């Protein structure tokens, strides 16, 4: 493992997943609050999201057994990293990174004497109630009903965090909903929706429902969880980091207002993208190529993924910034970073 030199100081946080969407915003928030950041990055990662930031780098993998050595001197851990894929072919990679990686990171944190860990789970691990009902932290869909290997891996990873906490580690679990805003470099599926809208590649859509939150509020929520959150000891000891429940139609209407571009008016029945996804996966799987429309993603769109974040607002002081402004900031970030041609 390769390690660069870091400055020993108090209030140092070890962050995994710092090159990702949530992680990059979290790193910036921690720096703004005056904390030292030590970030774990994979050798294959492109740390474009963290360029020119005054942080210390540790090059390694979530499953490296000697990470405790690199955590020495840090007060806290934010375990944000996760492998994200909606393609069933990646099931083993999802389990290895999300579940076994979480188990190893937490074991290393304990060995390093980390005082408190915030584990970034997801509302994906909670599941949905359906029929437009909002799920809160006390709700749990049976794991077999969670759609796809990614959601199931996040469920089992959260169980790793809960087990470690029950065995004595101080761990706070947060479950972000659907973040939007700047630094969506990959981009996320929601970022892809924004880009398809901007590129005029969305003649029609399958209407669904999401819980959106400004990604910078998610970042702030992580630090607030470290400062004020309750240690996870029983199921439900977690914090949904979310804000506004909104239909995809509503999101597209906001984007139309922000950009002046017309929103698509036509919806398509679910069977159409399901058929396309099924055919695409059957053709591409033998070739080792990822489908453009994963079957699990289409199945998820059949559900309104609505959540109640009032617990995090009341107990942590989770900010609730304007969703329309977060969408506008995402649009401007994509435009300013070459993702879409500006007129």
Swiss-Prot record:
Which pathway does it serve?
Secondary metabolite biosynthesis; flavonoid biosynthesis
Gene Ontology MF terms in the entry: dihydrokaempferol 4-reductase activity; oxidoreductase activity, acting on the CH-OH group of donors, NAD or NADP as acceptor
Q: What is its EC number?
A: 1.1.1.219
Q: Top enzyme class of this protein?
A: oxidoreductase
Keywords, in A-Z order: Flavonoid biosynthesis, NADP, Oxidoreductase
UniProt keyword Disulfide bond, yes or no: no
Q: Which CDD domains does the record associate with it? A: AR_FR_like_1_SDR_e
* GO biological process terms, semicolon-separated: flavonoid biosynthetic process
| Family to which the UniProt record says this protein belongs | Belongs to the NAD(P)-dependent epimerase/dehydratase family. Dihydroflavonol-4-reductase subfamily.
Q: What is this protein called?
A: Putative dihydroflavonol 4-reductase
